[in-house]
Amino acid sequence: MNEKESGREHTGIAAEMKVLLREPPLLIGILAVFLLFAVFIIYPFVKILLVPASADWMRAVTDKEFIEVFSHTIFSSFVATATAIVFGFIFAYGVNYTNMPCKRFFQVVALLPTMAPSVVSGLAFIMLFGRRGFITWEMLHLKVDLYGPVGLWAAQTIAFFPLAYITISGVLKNISPNLELAAQNLGAKGWYLFRTVTLRLATPGLASAFLLVGINSLADFGNPMLVGGNYHVLATEAYTQVTGAWDLPMGATLSVFLVIPTLIVFFVQRYYLEKNSYVTVTGKPVAGLIRVTAGPAATWCFFTFCMLLSLGILMIIGVVVLFAFTVSFGADYTFTLEYFKEGVINSNVMVNSWVASMSTAAISTVFGIALAFLVLRKKFPGGTVMDFLAMLPVSLPGTFIGLAMILAFNDGPLEMTGTLAIIILGMALRQLPVGYRQAVAGLKQIEGSLEQASTNLGAGSFTTFRKIVLPMLKNSLSVSFVYAFMRSMNTLSTVIFLVSPEWNLASINIMSLANQGFLPTASATAVGIMLVIYLTFGVVKLILRDKINIFDL
C-alpha cells in the first residue's frame, strides 16, 4: 500500500469516527456489540484453547486410540456427506427439472426430517434394524448387528439429506433457463448440456451443501451415540472424556481437534467459490421461457428414486409414531397414550425446550437483524471484524461451543452453570449466523434511500431501525424466528454439556431414554417435539396470514 492509499484509508476512518461521535447512541450500540462478542465468543473460545496442557495435545496426536477416533470421524462424515449430497441433488433435480407427478408431496416429505431431532433417524434405525429390530428380527428373523459405521452412515444420510436438498434446490430453482436454452439451440443436449451448463451453475449450491452437511455430520452427537456402537467419533469421545473419564483437558483437546476439519471444509468451500465464477451475465431473464426438462424415461427414473426415498422417510417417522402410541410395537398394537403422558405431559423437559427455544429464536433473530443493519448500513471501523464474528459460529461444532461455554462461565462474576441462561446463550450463539445472513439478504433487497430519507428528516439510527427497517423485514424476521426455533427444539450437541437436572431438554431426554432402552417413551418425546414445532409454525402462519411457508422450496 503506497502513502496515497494509506492517507485515503486514514481519512476514511477519521470521517467514520466523526459520524459516530455525532450520534452517541449508535457509537454506544456498536461498542456494546463488540463487548458482547468479546465476552460471549472470543473469551469462551480462548478459554477452551488454554485448558489443555502440552501433554494433552501430544497425547491426542500420538495415542493410537485417538488417531483411530479422528480417522473414524473424517471417514464417516465424508461418506455420509457424499451420500446426502448425491441424494439431495437427485431429489432437487427431479423436483425442479422434470415434469414428474407428486412434486408437492415430495417437497413436503423431504422437509419432514428437519422438524424432528436428527437423532430420530438413529432411533428409527434401532427400532427397524437393531438387534431386536422389527425388520431384521421380527420379520426376517436375522441375527445381524448393524451398529457401527454402516448404521451411522444410514442414520446420518437420512438425517442430513434435507439440508442438502434445501440448499441445492434453492440454487437450481434460481438458475435462469436462458443459458440452457442457448446451449440447446447450439446443439448441446442430454448429458453434455447437463454437465457443461446446469451442473456448473449448480456448483455454488453443491459447495454450500457440502459445507452444511459436512459440518453437521462432523459435529453430530446423537446418531453416533445411539447407533455408532464401538465406532467412536470425536464428538462422542470428547463427551466420554469429560463425563466418563473426568478428563476435562482431553475433552477440550478433542473438541478443538473437531474444529480443524470443519474449518478446513469452510475455507475450502469459500476458496473454491471465490476462485471460480458462476454468475450468468445474460442480464435479466426473458419472460415466458420454459426450462429445459428431462425426457420421459429420465423423468420416471427420477420419480422412482424420489418415491422410494420419500417412502423411506415416511417409514422412519411412521415407526417412531407407532412406537409412541402402541402398547408394544410388533406384538400388541393397542392404542395407548401412556408413553406420551410419561415423556411429554408429565415431564417438564418439553416446557423447558419450548421456553429455551422461543428465547433463543427471539434473541438470535433480533440481534441478527441489528447486526445486519450495522454492518450493511453503517460505516464504522471494525465492520469486517463484526461480520466475521457474527458468522464464526456456523463453522464450529456444537460440542465445541457447549464445552467452551461451560468452561468460560463455570465460575466468576458470570457464573451460569446449570441455569437456563447458559442453555439459551449456547443455542443463540449457534443460531446467530442464520438470523444474521437472513437479515443481510433481506436488507439487500431494500432501497437504502428510504433510510436516508428518515435520517434527513431528523430520525436517529435506532428510530430508523425501529420504524423503517424492522417493519420492512417482517418476512425475513419471521423465517429466521421459525427456523431458529425449529433448530433449537431439535438441538443436541450444543447443549449436551449445558443441561442440568433442573434444566433438562427434550432432545437430550430422547437420547437418554433410548440409551436406557425406553424406546417407546423416547419415541413419544420425539413426536412431542414435532407437534410443538408444527403448532408453533401454525400460530406464526396464522399471525402473518399465510405470508410464510417453509415448504415453498
Residue ranges of predicted features:
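Membrane-water interface segments at the C-terminal ends of transmembrane alpha-helices
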Residues: 21-55, 64-173, 199-222, 253-270, ...
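The alpha-helix within a helix-turn-helix
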Residues: 183-184, 454
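Helix-loop-helix hairpin linking two adjacent transmembrane segments in secondary transporters
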Residues: 236-261
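A short amphipathic helical element positioned immediately N-terminal to and/or at the very start
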Residues: 14-20, 55-62, 335-344
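Short glycine/proline-centered loop/turn elements that form peptide/ligand docking sites
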Residues: 175-178, 446-450
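Glycine-rich helix-loop "coupling/hinge" segments at transmembrane-helix boundaries
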Residues: 221-245, 332, 492-519, 553
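Transmembrane alpha-helical segments of polytopic membrane transport and secretion proteins
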Residues: 1-32, 270-308, 541-553
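Juxtamembrane inter-helical linkers in multi-pass membrane proteins
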Residues: 189, 276-292, 329-343
